[in-house]
Amino acid sequence: MNQHPGIIGKKIGMTQIFNETGEVLRCTVVQAGCVVIGKRTLEKDGYSALILGLGERAEKHTTKPVAGAYKKSGQTPKRIVRELRCSPEHAAKYEIGTTLKVDEIFEVGQRVDAQGRSRGRGFSGVIRRWSFAGAVNSHGTHEYFRHGGSIGTNMTPGRTLPGLKMPGHYGDETVSALNLKIAKLLPEDNLILIEGPVPGPKNQVVTIRGAVKKRGGKGIVPVQQPTKKKGG
């Protein structure tokens, strides 16, 4: 489980910046600004985590038990609430009501994982949803150009197996983009510029955390270069 420090933010859109060598970098802009609204501790809950809130929610749209919990902690109801696990040392740095700053959590050049909800594309066929090639367009093919082919089996087991790639709802799923690089931080506006795309449309809530599967790190097997034999 990812226990690296992280934040929740809102995807603003994409832009371009130049690096030190003049190369154009296509970046996704994420607006941070989440507030610590609660904590989990080892002594009470058995694990350590920060409960973060983003955006405001009208109290009339909040149930009374939840509104009472917010009032007890001195906070206003939040539209988005996420619980991010972290080390006890990291959780101890922040008090309830503190707004997380991007320059306190991340640094330029750091690798991060971004998680969000992908753009929904509705009911789609197998060519769009699964990149099937489709049937041939000649030699007697009739009204079968974009079909997925056979979905059945033999007499045993005699049924369509679960998990088969078929037409259905495409998108609107939780997607994680791994090992993205932070190109720039704007602490005065609490913005993060991340190289490459981040899942979801504009105004989508995303979770940004330190990368788990760092490139060249543990779990990554380096490519072995062939060595020439002596005298060969």
UniProtKB/Swiss-Prot annotation:
- On whether rRNA-binding is a keyword of this UniProt record, the answer is yes
Provide a Gene Ontology MF annotation, just one.
Answer: structural constituent of ribosome
| Classification via InterPro entries | Ribosomal_uL3, Ribosomal_uL3_bac/org-type, Ribosomal_uL3_CS, Transl_B-barrel_sf
| Family matches, as Gene3D superfamilies | 3.30.160.810, Translation factors
Q: What is this protein called?
A: Large ribosomal subunit protein uL3
* Organism (species): Sorangium cellulosum (strain So ce56) (Polyangium cellulosum (strain So ce56))
* One family name in Pfam for this protein: Ribosomal_L3
Question: Record's family?
Answer: Belongs to the universal ribosomal protein uL3 family.
GN (gene name): rplC
Q: Which residues form the signal peptide?
A: none
Recorded hits in NCBIfam families, A to Z, give: L3_bact
**Subunit:** Part of the 50S ribosomal subunit. Forms a cluster with proteins L14 and L19.
Cellular component (GO) terms are: cytosolic large ribosomal subunit
